[in-house]
């Protein structure tokens, strides 16, 4: 059960794995899925149910939600209120006729971590609006091409942007930097799915960018005009 914290509580609270009492207002049951909280309107709601370890979520330039997942097929276009494919167990609504399946027309291996839709312009134009995902079992950074179709999308296999030759390379989180480069967190450990962390000091961050691309440094944003701030959205 999750919901808006009572009193001075926080959205995320440390405690039991399955606490019996959450002390929240308007509690809502969720067993896998996405929820959101509006800090200004003080409103809490479940967005969608389902998935399996959805470790990556991002928005395209029209505000559409896309999510990656672990073990089950790897990519979904998320519609608020939807009930989606889950790894196991029962859906929150027992009367669901059929859940919403992946938008992809292909499969990658096993688990994905992280998801970012590339809306910058430092990389070649063909990467614009592609979704970048790390695959922890393939030791790779993969891309899918998002093609609009009807009211949804199809995910086509794009470039394998990075293929590591290291069995301990575990890309897990992705960010698009202010310079337009793609940054990948590599937790670098031989145990991919276990609970033991053997190497606690070997994690690394990789930067993927065109040769010679350094971005802009030493900028005082407070001194820039609105037009100059807008121009900084371009990374070339």
Question: What do the predicted segments below correspond to?
Answer:
Residues 1-231, 235:
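Beta-propeller blade termini and top-face loops
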């Amino acid at each position: 059960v999750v919901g808006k914290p009572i009193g001075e509580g926080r959205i995320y609270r440390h405690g039991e794995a399955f606490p019996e009492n959450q002390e929240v207002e308007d509690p809502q049951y969720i067993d896998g899925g996405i929820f959101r909280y509006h800090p200004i309107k003080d409103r809490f709601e479940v967005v969608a149910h389902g998935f399996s370890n959805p470790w990556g979520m991002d928005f395209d330039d029209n505000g559409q939600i896309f999510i990656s997942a672990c073990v089950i097929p790897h990519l979904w276009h998320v519609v608020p209120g939807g009930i989606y494919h889950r790894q196991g167990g029962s859906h929150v609504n027992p009367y669901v006729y059929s859940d919403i399946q992946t938008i992809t027309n292909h499969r990658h291996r096993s688990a994905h971590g992280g998801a970012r839709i590339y809306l910058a312009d430092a990389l070649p134009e063909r990467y614009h609006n592609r979704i970048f995902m790390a695959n922890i079992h393939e030791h790779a950074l993969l891309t899918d091409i998002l093609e609009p179709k009807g009211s949804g999308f199809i995910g086509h296999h794009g470039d394998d942007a990075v293929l590591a030759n290291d069995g301990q390379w575990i890309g897990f989180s992705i960010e698009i930097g202010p310079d337009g480069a793609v940054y990948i967190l590599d937790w670098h450990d031989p145990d991919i799915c276990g609970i033991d962390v053997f190497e606690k000091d070997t994690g690394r961050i990789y930067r993927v960018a065109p040769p010679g691309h350094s971005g802009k440094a030493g900028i005082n944003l407070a001194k820039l005009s609105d037009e100059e701030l807008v121009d900084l959205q371009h990374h070339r």
